[in-house]
Each structure stands twice: as C-alpha cells, then as structure tokens.
Amino acid sequence: MKLGIVIFPSKMIQDKANGLRKRYDPHYALVPPHITLKTPFEAQDEQLESIVNELHTIASKTNPFTLHVGKVGSFAPVNNVLYFKVEKTPELTFLNEEMHSGLFTQEREYAFVPHLTIGQGLSDAEHADVLGRLRMKDFYYEQPIDRFHLLYQLENGTWTVHETFRLGKGNN
C-alpha cells in the first residue's frame, strides 16, 4: 500500500489554496491541500501497526505549534511547482527528521522545504505568468497545529486518512 504523512491546514487556508489549485493543479481532486511531512512511500500491510505505533511516539514528542503560511514560491527550474511558502519551524523540522530515521529510512529525493502546493504541471510560459501574478499578491495566514495524519492511497488515486495523531504528551 502507498502511504503518506501530512498536515492539513485550516479550512480557510485550504479554501484559498483550492481556489488556485482548481485552475493550476491536476492533482486537485486527489488530495486536499496539505503540507507533506513524508512523501508517499510503499509499505506492506503487516508493517502498518509498527508505522502507526512509531507515529504515536513521534507525535507525543512534539508540542503543538503555530503554522505560518505566506507568499508564493516556486521550485523552478527543478520543476514548475507553485506553492504557498510555509515557515520552517523547529517542530516541522523535527517531525520531518523523525519521519526519515529509525523505522522510516526512505531516501530523501529533495531537501525538506515545507510548502502548500497550489499549482504543478504547468508549461514554462504559464508557470512564469502565474508566478509573476501571484507574487504581487499579499498572502499571510497562521494557525495552531495540534495534529498530523497518516494517509493511504485508494485504487482510484485519491488519498484518504488512515489515522490522525495529536501532538503533545498524553494525546495519543
């Protein structure tokens, strides 16, 4: 099965991102707007219990924190992905590092850049045009974060929540 680990922002932030994703992200219908803590990875059914237990441990070692989302960025020239920048807090860094060690030893394809994708798969010209327009707009949102989610991919390509993990001691 294919799994992923994410943080979902508030409905207000998701609505703002979805307003752009409808036009600029072909994966719009597959998964809600999110911040990826661990990119999709393959796991066997019998590994699921160990993964869930490890995520409970990680969540209990992480305090709730404030998510800061603002400005539009891009991964160009590596790829034409547009995103809302997410401030790299110590808690986000800790979560990402924990999800790439111990039980989770998958190689990283890219360095950890917390973000909320709003567009991908754009031509170079469309990417430059949209990026230029969005960089002129002022985006800034913040919200408390007290949980993350383990997702799994269904046969039709959509993602759904398998389990939610609350941050902080005594919450799991």
From Swiss-Prot:
The keyword Hydrolase applies. A motif (HXTX 1) lies at residues 34-37. Keywords: Hydrolase. A motif (HXTX 2) lies at residues 115-118. It comes from the Bacteria. Pfam families: 2_5_RNA_ligase2. It is an enzyme of class 3 (hydrolase). Belongs to the 2H phosphoesterase superfamily. YjcG family. This is Putative phosphoesterase BC_1225.
